[in-house]
């Protein structure tokens, strides 16, 4: 299962030419995709207008909905934050820690366009969808 992060959805809906948005476009309807409940909230918060909101909500409702948090993930996310901090890595957003940890715990791949996930890949085994080295360059 591939969980798609907010950064990719924003690029996709804005028509931004990014490797991640192109990858999402190729995966829609071809691969099982999931959206986290927190990601759903973030994406829908950014939508202008009622009609666009309903169209976006309808599209996202076709995906598997994943509860990102929960007690076990919350505790493991705190552990992951502490592990990275001990390595000198500053995690800027708690939501990214939760999303990365849900993916690690559940064995999901993450499709993202956010450099903040790279330490989770490098040090904690987060599996991600290959879109080239666009974030690493």
Give the label of every model feature segment.
Residues 1, 100, 104-137:
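Acidic, PIN/NYN-like endoribonuclease modules and their adjacent C-terminal/linker elements
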Residues 1-35, 45-58, 135-137:
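Short, well-structured N-terminal submotif of metal-dependent ribonuclease cores
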Residues 5, 11, 96, 114-116:
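Acidic active-site catalytic centers that drive phospho-/nucleotidyl reactions
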Residues 9-10, 40-43, 117:
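A generic structural signal for short hydrophobic patches within well-formed alpha-helices
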Residues 19, 65-113:
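Active-site neighborhoods of divalent-metal-dependent phosphate/nucleic-acid chemistry enzymes
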Residues 30-31, 62-63, 87, 106, ...:
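Structured helix-beta-strand junction loops
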Residues 41-42, 72-76, 133-137:
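A short acidic, often aromatic-flanked loop/helix-cap motif at beta-alpha or helix-coil junctions
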Residues 50-54, 84-85, 127-131:
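Short, hinge-like loop/turn segments at secondary-structure boundaries
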